[in-house]
């Protein structure tokens, strides 16, 4: 089960390791650094090391673990901050006695779960009841916001059977809480189990994503929605607002459980994001957001190989909570850093480079990641539904969206929210470019909006989007010939598009009135702008100049509404405003006819 190092090249080690398996977890050197076998040639194994290899030398031992890199899944996950291989950073700090992570800290010193923690276990099954892998055996109240359901692990060795023993009471995480009698023998179930991070957890069938994931961000929810179980990408250059967008989603997205994965970002930026997340409160209960969050941190100065582990680790944790029947959101920031790590390791082990040096399997790895999102019927004897939504930022060098990571990501996602430096530098946030963004979920979530908010939602949304496209065309004419060359109708279109941009798309992420924006507030803000457009068209046809309409008091108030009307009074206040807006435009029209 052991071998010797032959050579070291940065994060990659070649070892003589008979019997090594692909993606097996190994411990490298005298200090037992975490590593993963990424290539096997005969008895030779190429290992990507998840810790700094400085000081390693040929001849040191490499010890096989006999199992793949796996996530530890069970109570005490919630609220933890992990590194890329699921070691709690708080424990590492206590052991290292330094701001920097000491090498060779194993799971024995920093276990991912507190196996000695005690919880009140409440069984959901009785002795004699038939159960299948994936069934809920009981639950523990881990935090005020989250009930942690204990599953009969869907491991390959577990088979359907009959509950032989289960009882309520106080148990440690490592205690046996049930015994299942199967054809293969007795299975003793503990509160926790391991799952290989590269293996997707099983489900019965995938369902169409029909319910929108409400994020409180108007540009996303209304114009380019994402459904629960969908996948989205947020590409953008430096300074365009990717991290703030991800932070806003982590705070206000209506998911029961959220997993931010800070993958390869700058250390000070990650620290700032962490401090922000730790201070955030759940908007519905006022309790700490950490009570329904697990954070994975892997900064740019940490070993590059661990970036890959952190992405898979976050997705596996997300699938685990999905299997409990929750709606889960995984936020990866950013997949470009993961791809760069993949490129470095691939080149170190001598694989043939593809476009821009990335390995030929880059699209495959991206597909494996994004395809783990989905709204699914869970396995087990009772039908339950859970969802895993993935939103990942992409950091293309120089904002070039044609580079391999961004262009390949486009193939596997349903919503694309590109951030524009032009909008960011003009202080328009979120800086999502409405001319380049798209969503494949508009048709599927339309039913939800029609049923819960208004049947007019799709028609008004499509009209506003077409006006933004029309504005871009008219701006070309204005740049060349000036506004004098435009008709009154075209001037009105420009005025309405300005209202859409300033009064709807623009949103202050740090203003409690403006963010989050409830679905009804979003719709009525949109309807108010649509009313200005529709009634204004009738007035212009009767000869009223667009400039006169623009100077009306209610129209002047349109861009400020988002900052003045709170979610709890939005329905009453905005309905009254729309009535007064229509009334004022019609009075101008009536005066014109006289």
Curated annotation (Swiss-Prot):
Could you give one GO CC term from the UniProt record? plasma membrane
Q: Which CDD domains match?
A: ATP-synt_V_A-type_alpha_C (cd18111), ATP-synt_V_A-type_alpha_N (cd18119), V_A-ATPase_A (cd01134)
GO molecular function, a single term:
proton-transporting ATPase activity, rotational mechanism
- UniProt keyword list: ATP synthesis, ATP-binding, Cell membrane, Hydrogen ion transport, Ion transport, Membrane, Nucleotide-binding, Translocase, Transport
Which GO biological process entries does UniProt record here?
Answer: proton motive force-driven plasma membrane ATP synthesis
Please give the chief subcellular localization of this protein.
membrane
Q: Which reaction does it catalyse?
A: ATP + H2O + 4 H(+)(in) = ADP + phosphate + 5 H(+)(out)
UniProt keyword Transport present:
yes
Its membrane topology, per UniProt?
A: Peripheral membrane protein
Q: According to its UniProt record, which protein family does this protein belong to?
A: Belongs to the ATPase alpha/beta chains family.
Q: How does it assemble?
A: Has multiple subunits with at least A(3), B(3), C, D, E, F, H, I and proteolipid K(x).
Q: Which PANTHER family match?
A: H(+)-TRANSPORTING TWO-SECTOR ATPASE, V-TYPE PROTON ATPASE CATALYTIC SUBUNIT A
Known role: Component of the A-type ATP synthase that produces ATP from ADP in the presence of a proton gradient across the membrane. The A chain is the catalytic subunit.
This one is known as A-type ATP synthase subunit A
